[in-house]
Amino acid sequence: MIVGVFANFQKELSKEILDKIVSVLKNEKIDWVLMNEKNKDSVKVNFLITIGGDGTLLNVVEKVAKENLPVLGINCGRVGYLTEEVADNIHFAIKKIIDNDYFIEERHLVEAHFKDKIFYALNDICLARSTFNIIDLSLYIDEVFAQEYRSDGIIIATATGSTAYSLSAGGPIVEPQLGVMVVTPICPHSLSSRSLVLGDDRVVKIKSESDEVLVVSDGRVADTLKKGEYLECKISSKKLKLVRLKKKNFYEVLREKIKE
């Protein structure tokens, strides 16, 4: 077993947590490797641990999706929908991993196709303006024209992402186990533009009617659409294997996090 550790060292407790993890792994004679932005796609591991917040875990979604890796997020950030609150008991958490005393919570991913590229996102794929100008985007569902949006952009969110950017843009909250896409316009120039919730067999195409539209995958710019180009999105057959050390009730977590 080789454990990969990906840490956000801008978080105050990250170094301390990393040292504790490494100490336990060494005592148990478990191989480990410290991952970073440069080597994360090339190193081979069997299990992944992230140290930070939800954003740190989102940073490794592409890797865990492509390699079908289980991932444990240890929270030392602010928002912790996806990560575990075990920073004060690292030895307990790592021992449970070594003993296979955990369960997997599968989360749906949205898969985006553009030219010869494929992007995987746990929260959302966004098409967003690159300047201060409003942009025009045409939405097609299963090749049928559905709507044209004159707005700051469009969010294509998973159920997991429905409590993230999509929620801030006025989208609905969806239970995380549902394999749906939530299409939410960003600051639309029309009162009739509303969110759409689409089933897991739908294929969405978004055509850019404007130049220089940014493609943003889980908060990171992935590419740019030019006028007339399409981005295709669907629920992926790949899923994120999120490691849980104890059962969590979605509505209890939601209530606590929305209060923050």
Curated annotation (Swiss-Prot):
InterPro entries for this protein: ATP-NAD_kinase_N (IPR017438), ATP-NAD_kinase_PpnK-typ_C (IPR017437), NAD/diacylglycerol_kinase_sf (IPR016064), NADK (IPR002504)
UniProt-listed GO biological process terms: NAD metabolic process; NADP biosynthetic process
Cofactor: a divalent metal cation
Species the sequence originates in: Caldicellulosiruptor saccharolyticus (strain ATCC 43494 / DSM 8903 / Tp8T 6331)
Signal sequence region: none
UniProt EC number: 2.7.1.23
Record-given protein name: NAD kinase
GO molecular function terms listed in the Swiss-Prot or TrEMBL record: ATP binding; metal ion binding; NAD binding; NAD+ kinase activity
Subcellular localization(s) per the UniProt record: Cytoplasm
Reactions catalysed: NAD(+) + ATP = ADP + NADP(+) + H(+)
Keywords noted in UniProt: ATP-binding, Cytoplasm, Kinase, NAD, NADP, Nucleotide-binding, Transferase
Binding site for NAD(+): 54-55, 123-124, 150, 152, 163-168
Function (record text): Involved in the regulation of the intracellular balance of NAD and NADP, and is a key enzyme in the biosynthesis of NADP. Catalyzes specifically the phosphorylation on 2'-hydroxyl of the adenosine moiety of NAD to yield NADP.
HAMAP family, per database record: NAD_kinase (MF_00361)
Nucleus as UniProt keyword: no
One Pfam match: NAD_kinase_C
Gene3D superfamilies for this protein: Probable inorganic polyphosphate/atp-NAD kinase, domain 1, Probable inorganic polyphosphate/atp-NAD kinase, domain 2
Family according to the record: Belongs to the NAD kinase family.
Active site, renumbered: 54 (proton acceptor)
GO cellular component, as recorded: cytoplasm
